[in-house]
Amino acid sequence: MKQSWLPMAALLAFGAVAASAEEVRVYNWSDYIDEELLAKFEAETGYDLVYDVFDSNEVLETKLLAGGSGYDVVVPTGTFLQRQIQAGAFQPLDYSKLPNSGNLWDVIKDRTAQYDPDNAYSINYMWGTTGIGVNVGKVAEVLGADAPINSLALVFDPANMEKLASCGVHFLDAPTEIIPAALAYIGEDPDSKDPEVLAKAEEALMAVRPYIQKFHSSEYINALANGEICVAFGWSGDILQARDRAAEADNGVDVAYNAPTEGALMWFDQMAVPVDAPNVEGAHAFLNFIMDANNMAAASNYVYYANGNKASQEFLIEDVIGDTAIYPDEATLANLYTVTPFDAGVQRTVTRLWTKVKSGQ
């Protein structure tokens, strides 16, 4: 879901207006890479790297569809990637310049092909699930030892949420993640595009809206790690980062992540090259660098997300490859679902719905 490299972000804020042939510009999610890899890329390739970050697919999509973003590599989630490909936002990859693509994992390539047929425009960077992060001790204090921490009822049952509000609840600011979860909770198809069914999701969300402290797609990491909140509905790797930050701080906060038993969204973040990328050669150099098995393992070992690189698995630390919250077992995989993009009409409905939910009015 991711570490911003501030020196590179500063270059965007204060630096070059036009990209040079020796400069590669990457736009990725915040807190999503080991910054040592960024310096390594520069040292190995001779390119100057400008690395900027974002916190929502909507922000990225606005830049892409407006054109002239100035980026060479961007990282949309699969559902957004699909409609961006259809809109002509990306150029096909030249796999002759990507020899490390042989390291990619067929299992993940098969799944990402639903968004990008033949994986012609993108490679998988990371994948994971969306679920529930809890401060185990605080939730037990509020709801008791039998609190349903592995169920969507924890965050969608108003009786639970009213109590949890006392210790703080954050939700992702991501309608494409939260609405499917609400639908799964009420027993509807998480991928439904039916306006009447989406209205039911709105009702479920509005019922718990008074108890949600904040909608944000990255702040919950530190808030959960520091004990400022007790529940976050967020991305698997972010919550596991919060767990590890709490452990490193030795602050007594015990963070746990669970994919809901009712089903969890499986998402894929894909690296792609915009159609108007200033440095296509540099973009391919960056993609090939990332697909190196050791480099991809270093990224996953840092952010605690699974990746689509089979060759990297021998270099993953046991805390990553051996954790079923990151690399799910077959039973968990069978309970994961994926969703398809909203068309323009449904997107307008969802935008209105989400605006209402966030405002609480």
Question: Can you annotate each of these PLM segments?
Answer:
Residues 22-84:
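Early extracytoplasmic/lumenal segment of secretory-pathway proteins
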Residues 75, 81, 85-211, 218-225:
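Extracytoplasmic ligand-binding site segments that recognize negatively charged/polar headgroups
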Residues 80-83, 231-252:
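A ligand-binding cleft/hinge motif common to bilobed small-molecule-binding domains
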Residues 91-102, 249-265, 274-277:
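Short beta-strand->loop
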Residues 133-138, 184-187, 267-279, 298:
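A bilobed periplasmic-binding-protein/Venus flytrap-type ligand-binding module shared by bacterial periplasmic
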Residues 198-207, 213, 251-272:
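Periplasmic-binding protein-like
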Residues 222, 330-361:
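Conserved C-terminal helix/tail region of periplasmic/extracytoplasmic solute-binding proteins
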Residues 274-335:
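Mature extracytoplasmic/periplasmic domains
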